[in-house]
Amino acid sequence: MSYLVPAEFVTKMVDAGESKVFMSTRDTLIRSFMAGAILALAAVFAIAITVQTGNPLIGAILFPVGFVMLYLMGFDLLTGVFMLVPLALLDKRPGVTMGGLLRNWGLVFVGNFAGALTVALMMAFVYTYGF
């Protein structure tokens, strides 16, 4: 990994925000759905470890693994999109509008929520029927 001076780092962040605005609806929903599902699974994993061991510190140490997985796989969590997309708007990138920003936020919210809800329903099914 090469070193970036702060100005180059900010430029990369603005570029990432711009690319998220122009991403297709399908790709945005898939990336955000997977992010919600992976983070929900990380929460389930942390809670299960905490309950099984009786030590909440172990669960707290293991929960960030979900965030690392999101970063490495390049998925979109709403909190990250809240930071990156407005940077492209503030930089006045061509084609980046308030409508595009709100569209992206809405799609990522729906995808994150759907992914987390899917995992919640799967966990409810598993624990209800004892699989």
Regions found by a protein language model. Name each.
Residues 1-131:
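Alpha-helical transmembrane segments and their helix-helix packing motifs
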